[in-house]
Amino acid sequence: IDFYIETPGGSGTAAEEIARFLRKKFESVNFVIAGEAKSAGTILALSGDNIYMTETGSLGPIDAQVKIGRSIVSAHDYKAWIDEKRIEASTTGRLNPLDAIVISQISPGEIYGVVNSLEYAKDLVKKWLCEYKFKTWNITKTRKVRVTPEMKQERASYVADLLCNHMEWRTHGRSLKIDDLQELIVIEKIDDDKKLADIVYRIKTVLKLIMSGSTTYKI
């Protein structure tokens, strides 16, 4: 199946359920992206055998966003801050009074929840890349070396860690275009095939018209 996806993001668990459903029904799953497929949309796209993108298409960082108090924050940033303060406390024996007040209001459950949210996205991406996207990756592009299962796992971990690294992208809403991603994973460029590009752009236009000019809702 060729699955056209366009979403600003959503639930990682929903992405997992959709991926499982598609894999039960279809032997090969390809994702087509002409708009944005951010956050959970990126996680889902990485479960595909192939990713096809236009120049207008974009993926995004997959660092989990968690609710802490009244704010939604990056799980990666939150964990990094906690780790930084832990090291500071063990090194100097004390904390800045303001930091101490903030930390005193954080429960162990919140910390574990943040860590689990972050690792959940990584686990999905690492598993799916090895099983599907890297399934036919047998020879390296530059050195022409045979690809081992360990090499696939190492590469999958690198991709997952990088996409989860909020410090790398600075904002969860960052748009990652084909040129940003080609060194990371292989993405097929739709615009290189004029006939295919015309079909995909028509689909994109029709869907936008349906969503904006009718009573149809995206759930």
Predicted regions and their residues:
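N-terminal organellar transit peptides
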Residues: 1-30, 52-54, 65-219
